[in-house]
């Protein structure tokens, strides 16, 4: 007997080797499964000729785990099911036969089962119920759903437990849901889910928006839900349970509403199932699973206040970290939109895991920590070993060359170079959880955008900057959210800024000594030593958007720390280029910029140093710009060496000037000598905020030094006669420079630049590139800044020269007063009405003195260069010179019917002085006939286009004050042919360039003003040059100004010139002489 059994045992061993190969089932035409051809069990059984005698039934049934009758769900047919475990006969599988007889006979005769389902291909097994069957056991594969109905619940549980165990064993290395969610949606065959439903996603809501319609497997795990398409191993939709706002069912439909933090965005998913019982079961299962989230320490129960997704789900924690600055003072670090890494609370599996603070970006910690869904990940190591050398240090700066950028106002930009999609925190009022009594209810939510600035709202903390409440932040990625208190790590804080004031460099904390290698937080300027080390700043000061020439030019200012190591390192300037490398050998930086007045160079005050319009070059630092009280003076700008508009090259003095153009020049006096005055730093600059008051310039206009740096709004023409009497230099050292070399350079020297409408006001005295000129070689450039002040200055001092621009006049006679006040830098519109000498009074009584076209006298002007027009007006109603100042005049248009009234005022000498309002009482548009023959420029410019031109200023500019508007009278009629409808090309005239060219010797037209000439007469003329004459000048009149180089070539770019004459058309006395 033994000899017979031995060969049988050897044969069984060889067949067992073939049976170990897993069978590969495939459906046939009828939908049933059959064995595929190959070296499998089916091939052995299909060769009965070579089949040895069958073993006993006990030997064939040793791998059967469970067997019995069950009904099929679809048709209710009863079948005999056999559950086999993995053995030498084959892998774990579920088979069913027509009946038990066929099963037993098949073991002897080799009868095939009706169907074989390998368990390693199954997703999971679940217990279900529907309208027909209350006890269902369902198996799910990637392409099929198979369910069996049991007779009772005990039988259902028995099959469910047996199938679950075999499915777990058949997978080999069992994958839990946490490992699955680490791969973020990647499914492996045999993955076990808590529940799986086969649903039909309807094209409604997210199904239509995300193209998710069709048959899917809805796989539910303990923390997430997946939508897996048939015959696919990868979940196309991965949703966290905490992102689900609500769920429900309606008849045979089940729907899920997710929030905006989900991977699909906010919306609803509608799924159709077999019947309403299945939908109800799905609803109940989802609710039970979501309630079970509170078992996990990183989640908290959802409340009604959080169901609308206005507040993020916070972590349950009672840990408080005292002594930390809130993120409102340090800014929120920006990170990539796709970054989904967040830590679990301290009660998690690994004690090294911790919260992620709101001030940490990607690249904060070097340790791995598990995400909400259990994913293990490593962050960047940009800040490795930060602060370890500082035992008791309070703050740590970002290391140099670590890819960091920063904003000057403690607004960090990014903590890693690859951050291309910053986030911004938008806070809204909301309600937090009542279970957290130590923290303020937080309602901030993070909404990312590739273009936002990444700034944080500070309403999370209350009014105190030292509030110790921490900040809750929620990312827009599904698995990255948290309640984030600041955390001390290695006894220090990362990237927090000290808000304490240090006025002296030696009063810094000791921890700052170890921070010398770290980078400054504010924009400090150094010499341009290495262009490769510069980084482009997002908050760099930019010029006008349309200025093509200026955008090509940059400025580099020398940091004060390069000159003196005792200076504070945070002395900062804003320039076009970004931060350069700082000198590490100098005093270290405390990172704080005090906003209080302090001593010179002893504070971190931010001086708004102007930038240049010249080519990039290294320049010396301008002298001290702050007085003893700590206020920074708006120092006068000196233009860069640009090409002279009149053909001459720039002088040497211009080359040596500080090229700081571009910032608003608020300086007073002649700035030419500020470079050449060796005692300039020793001069007192004791100005205070008093001089920023509106009428405080009156005390400054009588001084002759350039120490007072407020702009007096006096006539630019007053300085004209100083060129002959006092010289062009107003500095104390008395050095004289040639007028033609210094003052002939007007702002029209940038005619070749296509200056358009920038975003800020620039009032440079020389080299200005923002002020248009009427007399360009090309078309007039658009004005750029809405100037809105009109200066009307009165002076009662007697003039030593008459005010006529006659042929034998000299440049020195082009003044308006004898007080020799310095001219401001590029005044706006100045109407200067002075008292004439008795000689002039006798010659012309109770009439307007001639007000000439002083905007054309660029050669003779010492300080201004015809940046804006001026109107020096001399009054003739004075019988004796006195010292009474009348500081206001009334400019009234079209008062021809009103006789002049004499407003006599007694001086201390008994002399009556008529009020200027009685003198300047009737103004009308006159004729631009001729100019002074004594003035000629080297290169006469071509005549501009004759015709009105109204140029609108920037719509974002300030609105004009009501006192700055000239109201047009209703009696004004249209007369001049040059006032056409072309003046309507701009709806509002903030800058009015009006050029009148009526017919010569036309006395009737010049006395009338066109109603349609410009809307500026109704809405306010902001920049206008009024050249007033006291009579109709005929070409043969001796007092008339003859054309020499053209009536427009003398103006180097002032605004429009309008001749005003008396409405009674009085002619100039021919007897007036110099």
From Swiss-Prot:
SMART domains: IRS (SM01244), PH (SM00233), PTBI (SM00310). A motif (YXXM motif 6) lies at residues 631-634. A motif (YXXM motif 4) lies at residues 592-595. A motif (YXXM motif 8) lies at residues 710-713. Residues 63-168 form the PH domain. A motif (YXXM motif 5) lies at residues 605-608. A motif (YXXM motif 3) lies at residues 496-499. It comes from the Eukaryota. PROSITE patterns: IRS_PTB, PH_DOMAIN. A motif (YXXM motif 7) lies at residues 663-666. One of its GO terms (molecular function) is SH2 domain binding. This is Insulin receptor substrate 2-A. It comes from Xenopus laevis (African clawed frog).
């Amino acid at each position: 007997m033994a000899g017979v059994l031995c060969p049988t045992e050897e044969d069984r061993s060889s067949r067992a080797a073939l049976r170990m190969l897993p069978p590969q089932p495939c459906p046939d035409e009828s939908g049933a499964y059959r064995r595929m051809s190959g070296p499998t069990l089916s091939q052995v059984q299909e060769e009965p000729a070579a089949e040895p005698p069958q073993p006993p039934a006990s030997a064939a049934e040793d791998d059967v785990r469970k067997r019995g009758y069950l009904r099929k769900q679809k048709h209710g047919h009863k079948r005999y099911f056999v559950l086999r475990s993995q053995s030498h006969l084959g892998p774990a599988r579920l088979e069913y036969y027509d009946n038990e007889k066929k099963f037993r006979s098949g073991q002897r005769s080799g009868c095939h089962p009706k169907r074989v389902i390998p368990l390693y291909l199954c997703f999971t097994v679940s217990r279900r119920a529907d309208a027909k069957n209350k006890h269902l056991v369902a198996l799910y594969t990637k392409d099929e759903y198979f369910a069996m109905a049991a007779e009772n619940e005990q039988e259902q549980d028995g099959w469910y437990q047996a199938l679950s165990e075999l499915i777990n064993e058949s997978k080999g290395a069992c994958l839990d849901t946490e490992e699955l969610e680490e791969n973020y949606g990647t499914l492996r065959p045999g993955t076990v889910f808590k529940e799986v439903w086969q649903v039909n996603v309807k094209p409604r809501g997210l199904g239509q928006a995300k193209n998710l319609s069709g048959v899917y497997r809805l796989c539910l795990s303990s923390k997430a839900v997946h939508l897996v398409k048939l015959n696919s191993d990868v979940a196309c939709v991965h949703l966290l349970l905490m992102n689900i706002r609500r769920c429900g069912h309606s008849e045979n439909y089940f729907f899920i509403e997710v929030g905006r933090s989900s991977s699909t965005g906010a919306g609803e998913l509608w799924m159709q199932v077999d019947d309403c019982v299945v939908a109800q079961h799905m609803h109940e299962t989802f609710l039970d699973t979501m309630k079970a989230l509170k078992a996990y320490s990183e989640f908290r129960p959802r409340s009604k206040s959080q169901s609308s997704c206005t507040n993020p789900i916070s972590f349950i924690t009672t840990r408080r970290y005292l002594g930390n600055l809130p993120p409102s003072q340090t800014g929120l670090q920006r990170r990539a939109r796709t970054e989904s890494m967040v830590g679990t609370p301290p009660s998690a599996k690994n004690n090294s895991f911790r919260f992620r603070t709101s001030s940490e970006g990607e690249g904060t910690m070097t340790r791995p920590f598990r995400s909400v869904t259990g994913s293990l990940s490593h962050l960047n190591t940009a800040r490795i070993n930060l602060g370890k050398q500082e035992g008791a240090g309070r703050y740590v700066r970002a290391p140099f060359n670590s890819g960091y950028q920063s904003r000057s106002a403690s607004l960090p930009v990014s903590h890693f170079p690859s951050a291309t999609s910053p986030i911004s925190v938008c806070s809204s009022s909301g309600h937090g959880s009542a279970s957290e009594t130590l923290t303020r209810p937080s309602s901030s939510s993070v909404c990312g955008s590739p273009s936002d600035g990444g700034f944080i709202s500070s309403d999370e903390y209350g009014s105190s900057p030292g509030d110790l409440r921490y900040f809750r932040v929620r990312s827009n990625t599904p698995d990255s959210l948290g309640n984030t208190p600041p955390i001390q790590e290695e006894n220090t804080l990362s990237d927090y800024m000290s808000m304490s004031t240090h006025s002296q460099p030696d009063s810094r904390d000791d921890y700052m000594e170890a921070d010398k290698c770290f980078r400054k937080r504010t924009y400090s300027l150094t010499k341009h030593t290495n262009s490769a080390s510069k980084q482009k700043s997002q908050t760099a000061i930019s010029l006008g958007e349309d200025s093509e020439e200026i955008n090509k030019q940059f400025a580099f200012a020398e940091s004060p720390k390069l000159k003196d190591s005792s200076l504070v390192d945070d002395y900062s300037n804003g320039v076009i280029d970004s931060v350069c490398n700082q000198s590490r050998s100098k005093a270290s930086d405390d990172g704080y910029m005090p906003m209080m007045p302090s001593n010179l160079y002893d504070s971190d005050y931010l001086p708004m140093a102007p930038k240049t319009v010249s080519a990039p070059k290294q320049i010396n630092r301008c002298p001290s710009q702050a007085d003893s009280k700590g206020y920074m003076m708006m120092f006068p700008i000196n233009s860069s060496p640009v090409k002279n508009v009149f053909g001459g090259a720039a002088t040497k003095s211009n080359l040596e000037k500080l090229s700081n153009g571009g910032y608003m020049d608020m300086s007073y006096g002649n700035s030419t000598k500020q470079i050449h005055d060796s005692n300039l730093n020793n001069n007192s600059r004791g100005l205070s905020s008093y001089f920023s008051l509106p009428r405080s310039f009156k005390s400054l206009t009588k001084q002759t030094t350039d120490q007072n740096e407020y702009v007096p709004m006096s006539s630019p023409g007053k300085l004209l006669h100083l060129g002959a009497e006092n010289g062009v230099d107003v500095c104390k050292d008395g050095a004289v420079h040639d007028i033609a070399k210094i003052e002939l350079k007007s702002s029209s020297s940038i005619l070749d630049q296509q200056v358009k409408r920038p975003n800020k006001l620039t009032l440079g005295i020389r080299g200005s590139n923002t002020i248009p000129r009427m007399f360009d070689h090309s078309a007039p450039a658009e004005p750029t800044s809405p100037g809105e002040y009109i200066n009307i200055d009165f002076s009662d001092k007697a003039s030593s020269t008459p005010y006529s621009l006659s042929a034998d006049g000299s440049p020195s006679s082009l003044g308006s007063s004898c007080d020799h006040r310095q001219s401001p830098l590029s005044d706006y519109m100045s109407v200067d009405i002075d008292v004439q000498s008795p000689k002039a009074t006798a010659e012309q009584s109770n009439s307007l003195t001639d007000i000439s076209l002083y905007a054309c006298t660029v050669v003779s002007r010492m300080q201004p260069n015809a940046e804006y027009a001026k109107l020096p007006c001399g009054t003739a109603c004075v019988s004796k010179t006195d010292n009474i100042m009348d500081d206001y005049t009334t400019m009234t248009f079209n008062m021809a019917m009103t006789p002049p009234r004499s407003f006599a005022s007694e001086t201390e000498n008994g002399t009556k002085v008529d009020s200027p309002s009685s003198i300047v009482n009737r103004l009308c548009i006159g004729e631009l006939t001729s100019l002074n023959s004594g003035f000629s420029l080297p290169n006469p410019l071509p005549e501009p286009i004759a015709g009105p031109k109204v140029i609108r200023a920037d719509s974002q500019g300030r609105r004009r004050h009501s006192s700055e508007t000239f109201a047009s009278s209703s009696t004004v009629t249209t007369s001049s042919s040059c006032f056409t409808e072309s003046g309507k090309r701009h709806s509002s005239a903030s800058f009015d360039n009006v050029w009148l060219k009526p017919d010569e010797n036309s006395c009737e037209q010049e006395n009338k003003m066109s109603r349609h000439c410009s809307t500026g007469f109704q809405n306010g003329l902001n920049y206008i040059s009024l050249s007033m004459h006291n009579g109709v000048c005929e070409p043969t009149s001796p007092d008339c100004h003859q054309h020499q180089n053209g009536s427009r070539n003398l103006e180097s770019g002032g605004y429009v010139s309008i001749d005003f004459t008396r409405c009674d058309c009085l002619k100039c006395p021919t007897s007036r002489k110099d």
